[in-house]
UniProtKB/Swiss-Prot annotation:
This is 4-hydroxy-tetrahydrodipicolinate reductase. It comes from Pseudomonas entomophila (strain L48). (S)-2,3,4,5-tetrahydrodipicolinate binds at H156, G165, T166. Belongs to the DapB family. The gene is dapB. Catalyzes the conversion of 4-hydroxy-tetrahydrodipicolinate (HTPA) to tetrahydrodipicolinate. Keywords: Amino-acid biosynthesis, Cytoplasm, Diaminopimelate biosynthesis, Lysine biosynthesis, NAD, NADP, Oxidoreductase.
Length: 267
């Protein structure tokens, strides 16, 4: 059995991850961690996820359970994830990282850690989204400079980063396929007298409202026709199942910084 620890276990995504781990053959939750000031520390993780008692108590320090897990799943905040990364690197533990909002410099820290431990880092662990990335690469290569490209994403009102990590990853895939640098061609929102659109730019539009789990559309607009590639998530469980799948896939892997394209053999 692959022994899995979940960081941020008392949160919405954490609870969903606990459920996904317990539902997956070959995986088992052996540690659950949350912030030290959480009033839920000491509670049974299974009960937090409405699964009933499973005998794994929520703790407040990763060091307390270092011998209890093989791989840590972390969907928290960049500052928290980087601390956990340093811990897992020192302890020789594998990581699944679904946290978004990292800076370029912080992503480099992930790459450095990948030289010593196996890591799967992805902006989105949904199988559908990762298939979409493959389709986006194909579409961009075929359509080339003959289209305007816009990325529209929507998430719930509590999401703190924008554009979403998934939208940015979609932009990176499209830009790379076209031989462009996303940092140079991205346009984040428009207002006022913007002038005519530069065809080589990639536009981003962000919506934050209600309880939207995650909608992403990439629009390729030409004269007389347009192509839209859309993915809509209706449940966080799709991300959680992908993360657990990645945790099982990492078993026995050499150190490296992998992503879901590797897990799904889409390269």
């Amino acid at each position: 059995m692959r022994r899995i620890a979940v960081m941020g276990a008392a949160g919405r995504m954490g609870k969903t991850l606990i459920e996904a781990v317990q539902q997956t053959p070959g995986a088992g939750l052996t540690a659950a961690i949350d912030r030290p000031d959480s009033s839920l520390v000491g509670a049974d993780a299974g009960e937090l996820a409405a699964l009933g008692r499973i005998g794994v108590l929520l703790c407040d320090d990763l060091a307390k359970v270092v011998d209890e897990f093989d791989v840590l799943i972390d969907f928290t905040h960049p500052s928290v994830t980087l601390k956990n990364l340093a811990f897992c690197r020192k302890a020789g533990k594998a990581m699944i990282i679904g946290t978004t909002g990292f800076s370029v410099e912080e992503k480099q820290l992930l790459a450095e850690a990948g030289k010593e431990i196996p890591i799967v880092f992805a902006a989105n662990f949904s199988v559908g989204v990762n298939l979409s990335l493959k389709l986006l690469d194909m579409a961009a290569r075929v359509l080339g400079d003959d289209v305007d490209i816009e990325i529209i994403e929507a998430h719930h009102r509590h999401k703190v980063d924008a554009p979403s990590g998934t939208a940015l990853r979609m932009g990176e895939v499209v830009a790379n396929a076209l031989g462009r640098d996303l940092q140079e061609v991205a346009v984040y929102g428009r207002e006022g007298q913007t002038g005519a659109r530069d065809r080589k730019t990639i536009g981003f539009a962000t919506v934050r409202a209600g309880d939207v789990v995650g909608d992403h559309t990439v629009l390729f607009a030409a004269e007389g026709e347009r192509l839209e590639i859309t993915h809509k998530a209706s449940s966080r469980m799709t991300f959680a199942k992908g993360a657990v799948r990645a945790a099982l896939w990492l078993d026995g892997r050499e150190p490296g910084l992998y992503d879901m394209q590797d897990v799904l053999e889409l390269r």
